[in-house]
Amino acid sequence: MRATPSQVWRWGAQAISLAACVLVWHVLSTQQAHLGLVTFANVPPPAEVWDAAWELVGSPKLSQHLSSSLLRVASGFVSASVLGVGLGLLIGRSRWARLALLAPLEVVRPIPAVAWIPLAILMIPSSEGSMVFITFVGALFPILLNTIHGVNGVDPRLVASARSLGTSPWRLFGQVILPSAAPSIVTGLSIGMGTCWFCLVTAEMISGQYGIGYYTWESYTVQAYANIIVGMLVIGLLGMGSSALIHWGGQRLMPWHRTQGGQA
């Protein structure tokens, strides 16, 4: 499909924005600038990071790093999606579930992923399982809260109309509640996927020999500064791409929402 002029303009603007960021990074790092409390004296310039990236691409460990991280993120995300959406639908529709579950979940929600590391090691003997658990915790609450928000945001007039027409509870859920809450659920899934990658470095600090987060942390310990930025950029690109894929799939599964939003 041919790109429209507005899409070309948008892509061009984004490319210019990225180029400007790289240019600023180059100037600050090569000049070893000091901006108040922030110094760029030890920040490698883009050219050095580019060389480190090419070195990683040519390394046989790249596939092992990527496959390990992708498996951990996928396992944590799928588990969080099943539990988060299920609990969110239950809490959103059931007053008793809300009273019983929401308060404990709200207490646990602000705890950062790094604080779960000691407990994850104690609860889960497998280091691989512990790493998956950290990514699971990171993704769970964005998915859960967005699902609850989506269910609570269903127009009560739609529910009342469906009930007045004799719609059964299961059909009411499948034909009114779930489609109305779906856009918010997809948003939660997209945010949750991004949070999974955000927690990856924390998760792979536990143990392991492979993974993009482990590669980033190991680069810091050996003071390979360019490799740190390479790892950060890889995590950022993978997180952005996977979140965009979820958003794209959600739009294709929700033609009613896409039409209302005016986007294809």
Which residue ranges define each predicted feature?
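Generic hydrophobic transmembrane alpha-helix motif, especially the helices
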Residues: 106-142, 149-150
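Transmembrane alpha-helical segments of polytopic membrane transport and secretion proteins
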Residues: 1-19, 244-264
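Short cytoplasmic-facing helical segments at TM-TM junctions of multi-pass membrane proteins
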Residues: 146, 150-189, 212, 216
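Transmembrane alpha-helices
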Residues: 133, 137, 169-202, 230, ...
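Membrane-spanning helices that line or support transport/gating and their immediate boundary helices
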Residues: 30, 34, 89, 99-103, ...
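Transmembrane-helix boundary motif in ABC transporter permease subunits
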Residues: 75-105
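Hydrophobic alpha-helical transmembrane segments of polytopic membrane proteins
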Residues: 213-250
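Periplasmic/extracellular loop-to-transmembrane helix junction in inner-membrane transport proteins
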Residues: 3, 31-78
